[in-house]
Amino acid sequence: MDSLANSINQFALEFSKKLAETDEGKNIFFSPWGISTTLAMVYLGTKGTTATQMAQVLQFDTDQDVKSSPENEKKRKVDLNSDQVGEIHFGFQKLISEINNPSNTYVLKTANGIYGEKTYPFHNKYIEDIKTYFGAKPQSVNFVEDSDQIRKDINSWVESQTEGKIPNLLPDDAVDSATKMVLVNALYFKGLWEHQFSVQDTTEKPFRINKTSSKPVQMMSMKKNLEVFHIEKPQATGLRLDYKNRDLSLLLILPEDVCGLDQLEKAITYDQLSEWTSEDMMEMYTVELHLPKFKLEQSYDLKTTLASMGMSDAFNQSKADFSGMSDERNLYLSNVFHKSFVEINEQGTEAAAGSASEISVRIKLPTIEINADHPFIFFIRHNKTNSILFYGRFCSP
């Protein structure tokens, strides 16, 4: 499971860099865990070069030394044997079970779906394996004759799976009579902070978009003993904010320079992120924290981004090899749709009962101020598995 978490986290960074190329100056929010899980469901039915490309993009090659070398990255070809592929899917099975454990103190609603044109029927074994490893069921639908109704049905299902928070995932032109197969992945998250902000301390403050312009935000404030890490190059400060029971943590990285986010995003690597956010790098401070309230709800049509990362054959009718899921030739992936929703506020989401008092050992710690009044990146991490569930960039209220 550790190597799978490494793969997901590496994918998070590579994917975020691709999004940053086209979404300059825009907010970003996606779930690398959600996207990886959905694509792994398709990977289960791929063979040949299609499988090789998907494994490479999803970082299923677990050799971290190879990953860390820019020279080797271009040359890397991932051909995994059946035992390795089996380990990957068994890893997802365990990871899904851990992250969706009913005893967790957070809510994570996920909609993962594979919809294939019914004239390309799925193998029974593929259907059984998807249910075993991912708890999902591929759907055979009639895109040829009823594509718009299928789109509406998919949207209704996603909306119900996410407690109404994610309606209309597929836009009007998302599918048509020529659609062969689409993937959908939508996630809604809510959690309570370990230390909640006081609503009375929230005030309107300027959020500096760059050195010359700003927008008003509702800025939350608290003074608490929190774990902090410092980054020397590029200069930035990181902070760990735990959710209830420390099942999850929000890791925020704030560049020192108002316009330093672009440099940080380009420079950050998997190894650096692992080092920065390790327990060894964390120091306890009394932190005067100022963090904007915000809600992020981002939708992505992933076809272009994934193809540009090297996963092109899956979307090409003449090259795609999905013979592991269907006997019919010319089956290919028409598109992948992803949407995530998160709200950051004083409570995390809803106020918790009986949280009025806090007992702590009175140890004098150095005091620092962290004022997130300019663009920053953040991660929501599942601590037990060290998996990045969500990646976000907040740069425009």
Swiss-Prot record:
PROSITE patterns referenced in this protein's UniProt entry, alphabetically: SERPIN
Feature type site, description Reactive bond: 362-363
CDD domains the record matches: serpinB10_bomapin
GO molecular function: serine-type endopeptidase inhibitor activity
Compartments (UniProt record): Nucleus; Cytoplasm
Motif (Nuclear localization signal): 74-77
Superkingdom classification of source: Eukaryota
InterPro entries reported for this sequence: Serpin_CS, Serpin_dom, Serpin_fam, Serpin_sf, Serpin_sf_1, Serpin_sf_2
The entry's keywords: Cytoplasm, Nucleus, Protease inhibitor, Serine protease inhibitor
Cellular component, GO annotation: cytoplasm; extracellular space; nucleus
Role summary: Protease inhibitor that may play a role in the regulation of protease activities during hematopoiesis and apoptosis induced by TNF. May regulate protease activities in the cytoplasm and in the nucleus.
Homology family: Belongs to the serpin family. Ov-serpin subfamily.
Official protein name in the record: Serpin B10
Organism, scientific name: Sorex araneus (Eurasian common shrew)
Lineage: Eukaryota, Metazoa, Chordata, Craniata, Vertebrata
